[in-house]
From Swiss-Prot:
Biological-process GO terms, alphabetical: carbohydrate derivative metabolic process; carbohydrate metabolic process
The entry's keywords: ATP-binding, CBS domain, Nucleotide-binding, Repeat
UniProt protein name: Uncharacterized protein CT_399
The keyword ATP-binding belongs to this UniProt entry's keyword annotation: yes
Residues annotated as domain SIS: 37-179
Domain CBS: 207-264, 273-328
One Pfam family matching this protein: CBS
Species, as recorded: Chlamydia trachomatis serovar D (strain ATCC VR-885 / DSM 19411 / UW-3/Cx)
Binding, ATP: 52-57
InterPro entries: CBS_dom (IPR000644), CBS_dom_sf (IPR046342), KdsD/KpsF-type (IPR004800), SIS_dom (IPR001347), SIS_dom_sf (IPR046348), SIS_Kpsf (IPR035474)
GO MF terms, alphabetically ordered: ATP binding; isomerase activity
């Protein structure tokens, strides 16, 4: 029978339990085994396989997908290993098997056949005295923590531990490989990740013909129609060669009015503008532009300069354009 309010109480109880077990994971997991395994993978020339049964198999698939996205030669071994799929495994390959208990029947049935290749076998388990651990050449021992369900049977906490380990291994390997954004982007050309990883500033800028310009001698009052009509919240202050001298924003206007009152309207822009503003090259990665906008004193617009001399303004990059493209 439904009792009003019980869902909230149970949810809160499980939430606190999640926080507790996550803390226990970080307190008890010996991560030195991860860097040791990473060293092994960095020197390895053959294929790398991961597998597991049930929910552990889902974690193995996710780890393989993550590694493949940055170019690692990693593959998933299906549960049909003994029905022909064993043929993809070659002598010297590394095979990593997930099993929380270390006693998963299907996994143990695979081991003699894998050993006959032979392969380097890595067991990933929460049971250091299990059969999987005993037969493995290298063992990753994950913390043995209580599951979240009332029976302590459903893979919840255990798969979270496996996932945390998987991400730690994958990201350590990625950093050691010195994978660049362009490397990653070449493997992920589609979707929102592809847009962010492969996009360049020149793909999203407003061209110079649409940029509001003023000379340094233009007064604040004279610049207001330009400032308001373009809707960017700024004007770029340039010389006759379109070299960027500074930027004047609606924020500069508000601060000037607060400090100097109406007298500011007679000031030339060169006296009130922001000199040496944040700028970005047209050939820069669009992700870099997001970092620049959000770092230090956050801004919503970046003047875009030429890639060669980085002095001549070629356009304007506004956060609204990035938002419309789905990059925020």
């Amino acid at each position: 029978m439904y009792v009003p309010g019980i869902a909230e109480n149970l949810c809160l109880d499980i939430f606190h339990k999640q926080k507790q077990v996550i803390s226990q994971y970080f307190a008890s997991f010996h991560y030195d085994c991860v860097h040791q395994l990473t060293e092994k993978l960095l020197c390895h020339q053959g294929s790398l396989f991961f597998s597991g049964i049930g929910k552990s198999g889902c974690i193995a698939r996710k780890l393989v997908a993550t590694m493949q996205s940055f170019g690692e030669k990693a593959f998933f071994l299906s549960g049909d290993l003994l029905h022909g799929d064993l043929g993809v495994v070659s002598p010297g390959d590394i095979v990593c098997l997930f099993s929380n208990s270390g006693e998963t029947r299907e996994i143990l049935e695979w081991i003699p056949h894998l050993k006959n290749r032979p392969v380097f076998l890595v067991g990933i388990t929460a049971a250091p005295c299990s059969s999987l651990a005993a037969f493995s050449d290298f063992v990753i021992v994950l913390p043995k923590l209580e599951e979240l369900d009332p029976f302590n049977l459903m893979p919840t906490t255990s798969t979270t531990c496996q996932l945390l380990f998987s991400d730690l291994l994958a990201m350590t390997l990625l950093r050691c490989r010195k994978i660049s954004l362009s490397d990653y982007g070449s493997n992920h050309p589609s979707g929102q990740i592809g847009l962010k990883a492969n996009g360049k500033v020149k793909d999203y800028l407003y061209p110079r013909t649409e940029v509001p310009f003023c000379s340094p001698l233009t007064t604040v009052a004279e610049s207001l129609p330009t400032l308001s009509s373009y809707g960017y919240g700024c004007v770029c202050v340039v010389n006759e060669l379109f070299e960027l001298l500074g930027i004047f924003t609606d924020g500069d206007l508000r601060r000037g009015l607060s400090e100097y009152g109406g007298d500011i309207l007679a000031y030339p822009l060169q006296q009130i503008m922001t000199r040496n503003p944040k700028v970005i090259s047209e050939d820069s990665d669009v992700l870099l532009s997001l970092e620049m906008m959000e770092s230090g004193n956050p801004v919503t617009v970046l003047p875009v300069v030429d890639a060669q001399q980085q002095r001549f303004i070629v356009g304007l990059l506004h956060m609204h354009a990035l938002a419309r493209a789905g990059l925020l």
